[in-house]
Each structure stands twice: as structure tokens, then as C-alpha cells.
Amino acid sequence: MFNRIRISTSLFLLLISFCIMQLISTGLSYVALRADNHNLERITVSSQQRDALSLSWVSLLQARNTLNRAGTRAALKVPQEQVDALMGGARSSLQKADLYFNQFLDTPRADEQEQQLADATRDSYENLRGALRELIVFLENRNLQAFMDQPTQKIQDRFEADFVQYLQLAKATTDEASASSQQAYGWSIWLVAGAVLMLLVVTLSAMWWLRTMLVQPLNIIRGHFERIASGDLSAPIEVYGRNEISQLFASLQRMQQSLIGTVGAVRDGAESILIGLQEIAEGNNDLSSRTEQQAASLEETAASMEQLTATVKQNADNARQASQLARDASSTAAKGGELADDVVTTMHDIANSSQKIGAITSVIDGIAFQTNILALNAAVEAARAGEQGRGFAVVAGEVRNLASRSAQAAKEIKLLIDESVSRVKHGSVLVENSGATMQDIVRSVTRVTDIMGEIASASDEQSRGIEQVTQAVTQMDQVTQQNAALVVESASAAAALEEQAITLADAVAVFRLADDNFVAPETSSTVKETLDCQTA
């Protein structure tokens, strides 16, 4: 029944009960305090009135006594200074009496009777005060007879009667206020006892309600929290009622179900992470092996590229040297072509000279022939002359012989010249062919020079390209080494992550679920081997 009432409503009702009791107690206390305060004010005012009136009465008596002494001394004819001093004291006493009586008049009055008595007292006081002032005037005027004849005692007795009557009224007021205070005190005792009894009943009821509705359910909730803190999620949480504690049980039940789902999800996630980490470790192992093979291949490639670079550089140097030799050969061939041209020109000149010599030889041959004819004619004429012409015949014979020999020599010279001309022509043709060949050689050498220059340029470009390839291979080698380092770091991270996953699995392993068969995993050997291999 009580667990269907909301705790806030119960606390509100309890608070309302305490407030009602407090209001009742406060109201009654206020009434009692107000009555006590009223009685206390009455007693205080009465005391103030009595004190002020008493002091005023005492001051008037002092003034009367002082004036009597002054009158006695004036009658004894003492120095006037002493009399004046006593009259000054009397005046001071009258001023004090006025001050005290004004305080008496300023106090409030409780009722009409008290006010009437106060008015009568004021009249008698003023009469007595006026009489005392007349005595002072009589003494100042040295009218001792009038001083002695004034009926001051009657006036004083009247004021004394009013004074005593007012004191009796003040005493009656004080006694009445005290009796009222005693009666209020008795009622207060009964009220306090009733309030304490009611408070005790309400307190015991509140304690029973708190124990039933709060303490016991909170102890049950604490037990559930302790079991959850120890990792036991298998204990069922039952919900009763519809108050805040029941809502707390429902929230705790939802929290338990949520924790069960979370722990299950974390366990599944830890297992999935471990499986993924094992696959990552195997992949890292394969990647590390391939990276090492790639690094070795890149090192071999780098060495081959270095050798190829040296070979290409050497080829480039040889090509430059061959190009230089080709340029030298081209220059030499050009010079040979120029010399061949000069030889052709010279051979042409020799051929022309040989032809001229042949013409001269023909002339000599003609002259020899004519000389022979002339020698024949001379021989004929010598024969005709007989003995006289014998010497001339001998001379003619010698001339003929010389002409024959000259003709024969001219023929031989002509044959030689013809042969020489023929050979010169053949040599000229050969020289011309040689010049053409030399020009072909010059063109070929020039082409070879150009080709060798292109080869040298291509070799330089190949050398630069190979250097760039070598740099690229070196960079690839560095990148491969960095990749290998990253593989090591990845393996280390995977191992650390697996350890964290195992730690997480160990952390959630403390939770016990219904139908629980979860076993915390251990570090996989693959990750350990991969980490050890990569670290090594």
C-alpha cells in the first residue's frame, strides 16, 4: 500500500504535518509570549512610574528640607551666602523633581482610572512645587514670617496621599501582571508537553515510514550495486510499486540490462578485435617478408644501376673520344681531298705539257723526216757529183743517219710521251676518282662525326637519366626501409592494441552474466612472433 504513494507526496505530507504543528506551537507560543510581553510591559511601566514618582517625591522632600534649613539659618541671621547656597541646592532639587515627574508623566497609562489618578497626582505635585517656590521667594525677600505661616505641610500631605495611592495602584497592576504571567506559564507548560508528545508520535511514525519506505529499499539497492560493482549481473532486479524508489529499482534494472548488453558487445568487440589483430599481424608478417625481398631487389638494382651508370659514362667518354677522332679524321680527309684536287690539277697540267711535248716531238719528227729527205737529196746530188761529192755524201749520210736516229728517237719519245700522256690521263682519272672518293669519305666522316656527336649527347642524356633512375632507386630503397620501419611500428602497435584488447577482455571478464561461458583470451602467438621478428 505505502509503496504506491510517492515519496515526494509522503515527504510533502510529513512536511505539512510538521509545518502545522510548528504553526500551532508558534501561534500558541506567540500568544503566550505576547501575554508575557504585555504583562512585562505593564510591570516595567509601573516600575518606571513608581521609580520616577518616588525620585520626584524624594527630590521634593530634599528641597523642603533644604528650604527649612535655609529658613532656620536666615532666622539665626547667619551670613547670606550660606542661605543662598542652601536655596541653590533647593532649586537644584526642584529641577530634579521636575525632571523625574516629567518622566512619570511621559509614561503611558493603562486605563482611565490610572489616568485620573495621574492627573490628580500632577495637580498635587504642582501645588507642592509652587509652594516650595514661594518659600524660596520668601527667603529671597527675607520674609521669614510669610515663610513660617505658609501651609506647606498640608499641600505636602495631599501630594503624599496621591503618591501613596498611585504606588498602591502600581503595586496592584504589578501583582495582576505577575498572576497573569504565572497563569500563562502554566498553559505554556501544558502546550509544550502536548507539542512534545505530538512531535514524538510524528517522529516515531516518520522513522517507521523512513525505515520501511527508504532505508530497507535503499539497502536492497545497495546490495544490487555491490553485486554489480563486483561484476555479478546475473541477479534479477524486481520492481514493486510506483513511487520514486520503485522508479529507482526500474532504472537500476534498465542499467543492469544495459550493462549486460554493453558487456556482451564489448566481449564480442574484443574477440573481433583480436581476430582482426591476428589477421593484421599475419598481413604485417607477409608485408615484412615482401618488403625485405623488395629491399634486397632494390639493393641489387641499385648496384646494377651503379655499374650501368659507370658503363654508360665510359661509353659517353668513348663516344666523345670517337667523335673527336672522327672530327680529326674528317679534317684530315678534307685536307686529303684538297690535296687530291691539287694533284688532279697538276696531272691536268702534266697532261697538257705532255701534249705540248708530243706536238714538239711531232715537229722534231717532221724536221728529221725533212732532214732525211734533204740528206737523200744531198746524197743523190753527191752521187751525181761523183768524187767531188763524196765527202758531201759522207756528210749527207751522217746527217741522214742522225736524221734517222733523230726520227727514231723522236718516235721513241713520242711513244713514251704518248704512253706518259695515256698514264697521266689514267692517273688523272684515278686522281679524280680518288678526289670524289675523298669527298665521299669526307661526307661519310662528317656524317660519322655528327652521329658520334648524337651518340655522345644520347650517352650523356642516358647517363643523366640513369643517374636520375639511380636516385629514384635510392629513394625507393629509403622508402622501402621506411616502410619496413613502419611495418615494425605497425606490428608493435598491433601487439600493443592486442594487449589492450586482452586487458579490455580481462576487464569485462569480471562481469558474470546469465548462462556465461566467456573465457578471457590470451595473446596470440602470431602477434608475438611477428613482433619478435620485426623487433629483431
Swiss-Prot record:
It is a multi-pass membrane protein. InterPro entries: 4HB_MCP_dom_sf, Chemotax_Me-accpt_rcpt, Chemotax_Me-accpt_rcpt_Me-site, HAMP_dom, MCP_chemotaxis, MCPsignal_dom, Tar_rcpt_lig-bd. Disulfide bonds: none annotated. Residues 269-498 form the Methyl-accepting transducer domain. The chain crosses the membrane at residues 11-31, 189-209. Residues 212-264 form the HAMP domain. SUPFAM superfamilies: Aspartate receptor, ligand-binding domain, Methyl-accepting chemotaxis protein (MCP) signaling domain. Residues 64-73 are annotated as: The 3 Arg may form a positively charged pocket, which binds the alpha-carboxyl group of the attractant AA. Residues 32-188 are periplasmic. It comes from the Bacteria. The modification Glutamate methyl ester (Gln) is found at Q293, Q307. This is Methyl-accepting chemotaxis aspartate transducer. This protein responds to changes in Asp concentration in the environment, transduces a signal from the outside to the inside of the cell, and facilitates sensory adaptation through various levels of methylation. Chemotactic-signal transducers respond to changes in the concentration of attractants and repellents in the environment, transduce a signal from the outside to the inside of the cell, and facilitate sensory adaptation through the variation of the level of methylation. Attractants increase the level of methylation while repellents decrease the level of methylation, the methyl groups are added by the methyltransferase CheR and removed by the methylesterase CheB. The gene is tas. It holds the Pfam family TarH. One of its GO terms (molecular function) is transmembrane signaling receptor activity. Keywords: Cell inner membrane, Cell membrane, Chemotaxis, Membrane, Methylation, Transducer, Transmembrane, Transmembrane helix. The modification Glutamate methyl ester (Glu) is found at E300, E489, E498. GO terms for cellular component: plasma membrane. Belongs to the methyl-accepting chemotaxis (MCP) protein family. Residues 1-10, 210-536 are cytoplasmic. One of its GO terms (biological process) is signal transduction. It is found in: Cell inner membrane.
